């Protein structure tokens, strides 16, 4: 969904890679997806700099393993199993210096992918995001919606790896 949206907004997009260097391979794309972002993947100060809407006038640098890279993105989509508040909290930030409100005001929308629904959420305070009732749709991407029961049978995997007892001559 994030990639579809980014492509509709601006053609080519960059999807982050390894947690050791999330901007590895970035080549100036104007749409960036920070996919499955975790609190330890990027320092909070760098995330604030990347998402600063007023930083477009001056060069924003993304942290990268060997040398930082200039970012020319006008769209940044973040996917994460963490809510924005959980992400902030898990980083162990000093709320007096870099408070959560700095991140919250940079977010145009917080969309939660639930098993059955996709919800636009609103920050309700005290770390809670609540779905907005008029902005909820069925989630066609979930296993539930697709009827995908791709659960794995451990015994089947075991037999596949080791072979049947008749094949044990290897």
Task: State the predicted function of each range.
Residues 9-13, 54-56:
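Short, flexible loop segments at the rims of nucleotide/cofactor-binding pockets, characterized by
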Residues 36-37:
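Walker B catalytic acidic pair
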Residues 40:
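The feature encodes the CheY-like receiver
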Residues 1-8:
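Glycine-rich phosphate-binding P-loop
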Residues 25-29:
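Short basic/glycine-enriched coil/helix segment immediately N-terminal to the Walker B
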Residues 11-23:
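Short beta-strand-centered segment that lines the nucleotide-binding/catalytic pocket of NTP-utilizing
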């Amino acid at each position: 969904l994030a990639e579809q949206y980014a492509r509709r907004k601006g053609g080519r997009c960059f999807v982050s890679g390894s947690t050791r260097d999330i901007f590895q391979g970035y080549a100036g794309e104007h749409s960036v997806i920070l996919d499955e972002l975790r609190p330890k993947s990027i320092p909070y100060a760098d995330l604030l700099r990347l998402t600063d809407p007023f930083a477009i006038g001056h060069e924003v640098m993304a942290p990268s393993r060997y040398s930082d890279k200039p970012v020319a993105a006008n769209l940044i989509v973040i996917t994460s199993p963490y809510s924005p508040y959980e992400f902030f909290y898990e980083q162990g930030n000093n709320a007096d210096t870099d408070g959560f409100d700095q991140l919250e005001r940079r977010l145009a929308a917080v969309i939660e992918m639930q098993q059955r629904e996709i919800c636009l959420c609103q920050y309700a305070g005290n770390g809670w995001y609540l779905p907005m009732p008029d902005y909820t749709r069925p989630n066609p991407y979930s296993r539930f919606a697709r009827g995908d029961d791709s659960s794995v049978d451990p015994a089947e995997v075991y037999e596949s790896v080791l072979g049947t007892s008749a094949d044990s001559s290897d």
